[in-house]
């Protein structure tokens, strides 16, 4: 059967389509298709009338490829969404260069012919994984927005009570509390602290901390009072400065509520997955990080082996050899998902902060011990964490695969027992 590759260069509201056969001959010159039901139905009918095996190839360009991919997939057409970087490297073989939508659609169609046997069919994601991916994208956008506002708040602290930020920790998604935000809302200027004696401030601070649900400590109060006493503020303690702070606090409070809402929903969705407890039981992983792990990784079963999962995180280090030269100091590729890599690194940071005697570490010590061993070998802390993350992902992949294999065996055994019971019932009748 003739192989027919359909290259789709996706844009926001329209796509350019080129249809090419296995010999590289253009069957239909590049044409424009708008992302409407009528035009996509026309495209699907056109592709079905072609005499051959049709595969539609498009680049992964954020979210714009999904409407057309979903519509054509529901029509029974093979869809493959490929990494845009792969197509870019493939296009670099063209010495002439140049870039237009028509030229790009030809390049994508040509890529489909060249890598026909390696094309992976895109599957419509299940509801849980889809929801987690959507929530994770929203979480990352809100997190970026929060970082901008947090920098604004830290700038305010540097001008109103310099040095105080060392004693103020930010939002904790486990407790859903933000000590820095609550503190500056109560003690908005250095003068608010030093106008009291240390004993008076300690009493006020401990009462406030207890009311807010923090651990009130006289030692913490003494440190804060000492910083306030010695610092030199640039901002005066006047109504204008207080109004500016209140605006920052309101913005940051809103983003914090958004983040807490998103993470709470992510945890609820992630708990529906059979493999959730496997990740949750690993040391360094709480409910928020476990939910974000699946939000950024998706369905682990789609990877053919653990190496593919490691490569998706972009922490694989390919060989570097030429002639007699063989590199011993290789860097990670960083070609995978940055969000997944960042989430994994956060897990390793949380794991490193734990102790060997803690229950979760004692039950699953492999990754923790491996990280310590790498540090003992003289590896920099970041390198040791990335190496440990590599091991962490391999362990997770093996355990999830084993879980689903056992579930499949149990399902087959159940079906077999059911069929035997039916057969016995018929025989008795």
How would you label these PLM feature ranges?
Residues 1-429:
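A detector of single, family-specific signature residues
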